[in-house]
């Protein structure tokens, strides 16, 4: 009985933390969606390069909602000793775990397919908004500065973009691989000669370089999810 009470308390405290994290993610996601400019101004230089490729606001809202609901279910199920809530918590966490494993396998096996899919989404956005949408342009400038890359695939992503039409030149990042002369006009010939790597390939390189760290974090998250599933099932099986 004492063991049951101890595990129940741990379950409540753990899920309370998850609940608060979900609420924080939701709050930040809503803030980014409503006032993205101020978010980028404060956190842009410090933000993860990987997050630059997605709409951060919607991503955080979706992730926050799932984490928030999961934390609430875990707390409620453990506190009220509700078998229904605990079983729902278990199955949602199991689905998330399976989805994460599947996503990891797909990412490892179908990297080329993922690149093609993302290219179809990202490149048209660059051609449409780079140079005309301030926040979008700032995000890409930060990404290209941090990763020392050019565009999603290469400099051709910027052809016909508002920036190229207005300046009759490509972003300086596309000509900054060798000479480091940012102030020089980046013509198509210079960009073609210097062949600065696209940001997707550069990001993959950085991830592979830090594979141990990435793998450790992923394993840690997976371990916590497995532990939470085991605890929830233990509580479920020991309830009257």
From Swiss-Prot:
Cytoplasmic side: 1-9, 74-88, 232-240
Coiled-coil stretches noted in the UniProt entry, renumbered to this chain: none
Location in or out of the cell: Lysosome membrane
UniProt xrefs under SUPFAM superfamilies: Tetraspanin (SSF48652)
Organism in which the protein naturally occurs: Macaca fascicularis (Crab-eating macaque)
Residue intervals annotated with topology Extracellular: 31-52, 110-210
The protein's assembly and partners: Interacts with SLC19A2. Interacts with NTRK1/TRKA.
The keyword Glycoprotein is assigned to this record: yes
A Pfam match: Tetraspanin
Top-level division of the source organism's lineage: Eukaryota
Name used for this protein in its record: Tetraspanin-1
GO cellular component, one term: cell junction
Protein role: Structural component of specialized membrane microdomains known as tetraspanin-enriched microdomains (TERMs), which act as platforms for receptor clustering and signaling. Participates thereby in diverse biological functions such as cell signal transduction, adhesion, migration and protein trafficking. Regulates neuronal differentiation in response to NGF by facilitating NGF-mediated activation of NTRK1/TRKA receptor tyrosine kinase and subsequent downstream signaling pathways. Plays a role in the inhibition of TNFalpha-induced apoptosis.
Keywords linked to the UniProt accession: Glycoprotein, Lysosome, Membrane, Transmembrane, Transmembrane helix
GO-annotated biological processes: protein stabilization
Family statement: Belongs to the tetraspanin (TM4SF) family.
Transmembrane regions: 10-30, 53-73, 89-109, 211-231
Membrane topology of this protein: Multi-pass membrane protein
Glycosylated sites: 154
């Amino acid at each position: 009985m004492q063991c049951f009470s101890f595990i129940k308390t741990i379950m409540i405290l753990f899920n309370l933390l998850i609940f608060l994290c979900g609420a924080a993610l939701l709050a930040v996601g809503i803030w980014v969606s409503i006032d993205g400019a101020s978010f980028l101004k404060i956190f842009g230089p410090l933000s993860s390069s990987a997050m630059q490729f997605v709409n951060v606001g919607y991503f955080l809202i979706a992730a926050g909602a799932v984490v928030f609901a999961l934390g609430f279910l875990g707390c409620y199920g453990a506190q009220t000793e509700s078998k229904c809530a605990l079983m729902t918590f278990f199955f949602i966490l199991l689905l998330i775990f399976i989805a994460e494993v599947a996503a990891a396998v797909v990412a490892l096996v179908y990297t080329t397919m993922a690149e093609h899919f993302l290219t179809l989404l990202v490149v048209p956005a660059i051609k449409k908004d780079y140079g005309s949408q301030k926040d979008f342009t700032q995000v890409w400038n930060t990404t290209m500065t941090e990763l020392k890359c050019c565009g999603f695939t290469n400099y051709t992503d910027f052809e016909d973009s508002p920036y190229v039409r207005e300046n009759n030149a490509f972003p300086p990042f596309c000509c900054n691989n060798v000479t480091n002369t940012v102030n020089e006009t980046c013509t198509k010939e210079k960009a073609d000669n210097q062949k600065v790597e696209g940001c997707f390939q550069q990001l993959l390189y950085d991830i592979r370089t830090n594979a141990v760290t990435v793998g450790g974090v992923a394993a840690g998250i997976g371990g916590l999810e497995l532990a939470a599933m085991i605890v929830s099932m233990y509580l479920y099986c020991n309830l009257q």
